[in-house]
Amino acid sequence: MDKKILIVEDQDDLRLLVRLSLKSLGRIVLASSAAEGLEKVRAEQPDLVTLDVWLGKGDSGLDVCRAIKSDPATAHIKVLLLSACGQQSDVEAGLQAGADSYMIKPFSPQSLGEAAAALLAA
């Protein structure tokens, strides 16, 4: 069975990079805002969500992650946070929000693919 991956990223170029990096792992669904991301999480029930920590317009990927993990219908979904914020406190905040993994930008397409594949296999 094909895996389903939801990419939540507000920047078009990064959304495309993540999509190209992960397309071999399954069916890709895209969202460009926190609200659209949560709507698609509930409707699509993806196996993995890649989630930008800062989604623009004051939206926080950490809040989206908390919402995913606090809802019994979606708590099982793996979340991979992506952020340019690489301080230890940022990583800890992401993991405390419920993320299964945290990657610091910039990253290579290969390292993103490997991290996503590991989460999908877990």
Question: Model segments located where?
Answer:
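Conserved acidic carboxylate
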Residues: E9
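Two-component/phosphorelay signaling modules centered on CheY-like receiver
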Residues: D12-V29
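Acidic, metal-coordinating helix/loop segments flanking the phosphotransfer/catalytic sites
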Residues: L30-L48
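Acidic catalytic/metal-coordinating carboxylates
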Residues: S33-E36, D59-D63
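Short amphipathic alpha-helix used as the core "switch/output" element in two-component signaling
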Residues: E39, L62-A75
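Alpha4 helix (beta4-alpha4-beta5 surface) of REC/receiver domains from two-component response regulators
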Residues: D63, G86-S101, E114
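C-terminal output helix
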Residues: F107-A116
